[in-house]
Amino acid sequence: YTLSLHDALPIWANNMETKSIMIVGVGGQGTLLASRILGAALISNGFDVKVSEVHGMSQRGGSVVTYVKYGSKVNSPIVNEGEADLILAFEQLEAARWLQYLKKDGTLIINTQKIDPMSVIIGNSIYPDGVLDAINKAGAKTTNLDALSLAVSAGSAKAVNVVLIGVMASHMDLNRDVWINAIKNTVPEKFLEMNLKAFDLGYNYNK
């Protein structure tokens, strides 16, 4: 789908090159809510934004990837190999699966949580060892964190997605208030306080 405020681009963004972000994880982790928060934050800042969601298996356990591209004018939502400026990975095996899409100078944020894929659950394979070591050897600018424990400390394991949005926000040139407003406009009110706490735990993770 396409989000756009055609005449609301800030002056500094009029000729901004297109940036590409990928949000990757497995079904049930809240990746789609995360992409909605990201899209809302970007569009409120005046960018042309295109979002494309791809579900390998949208039920719990299947790989889910969302492409988000933004700039002064975006033609296609699809991100090709070697084009992503940032990859937000909700699970370490998914980070490895999509690593080739990252630019050489791109940023990779990884939730170190392990979620067994269906092939492991049914006994056809085992979860590989050394995933994070292999990723780190690839030379990407990587932030590894246990987002699950931060989410639990915020009040719910389900807040992993907003913790990770907070970490991503700390790597981007958008004002914190833009993110807070995007969360307020996206998350149900009864979960708002918990999610704002989760966002700040992520946002301040490296500070």
Whereabouts are the PLM-identified features?
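Long, charged N-terminal interaction/targeting segments
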Residues: 1-2, 137
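Short, small-residue-biased leader/transition segments that mark boundaries at the very start
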Residues: 2-9
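Active-site cofactor/cluster-binding pocket
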Residues: 13-207
